Regions:
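Nucleic-acid endo/exonuclease domains
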Residues: 1-145
Length: 145
């Protein structure tokens, strides 16, 4: 199935090592175990990084392969893909929608160029989001100590 960038895996390993231990067994990304797979009507969708027990997905979008809207106009034909930027955006949007509708998982998109410029802040934002979702999950559970 799909390709992945080395940069994405560096980010995902860094997040994985900083996230709470009790979430790690429900974490999926290419180099750890596999990408998270959802099948709908015999169409397979792979997701870059998923923590399924807090319903969080991170998609690491390469600026070229996913036609970063800060770099492409909707009618641009994207190098290497030979597709219109708007078609790539529609496909990516549908993939995110499928995950939400079929698994109730929300998606955070990280653009490669943003990551390159701002690694530390993006990583902190992601870890904070993971902790926030984990706290919500724990506070809404029926288990009491």
């Amino acid at each position: 199935f799909g390709g992945f960038s080395k940069s994405s895996q560096k980010l995902f390993w860094s997040i994985y090592h900083k996230m709470p231990e009790h979430l790690k067994d429900k974490c999926y990304f290419k180099e750890l175990n596999k990408e998270f797979l959802v099948s709908v009507n015999n169409i397979f969708y792979l997701y870059d990084f998923v923590i399924s027990n807090i319903n969080l997905c991170i998609e690491f979008n390469g600026d070229i392969w996913h036609a970063n809207p800060n770099k492409y106009k909707k009618d641009d034909t994207v190098l290497f893909t030979n597709k219109l930027a708007s078609d790539i955006w529609d496909k990516d949007e549908n993939k995110i929608k499928i995950l939400k509708e079929h698994r109730n998982i929300d998606t955070l998109v990280i653009w490669e160029s943003d990551w390159t410029k701002n690694k530390h802040d993006i990583e902190i934002d992601i870890i904070n989001k993971i902790c926030e979702l984990d706290t919500k999950r724990i506070s809404t559970s029926t288990i009491s100590c």
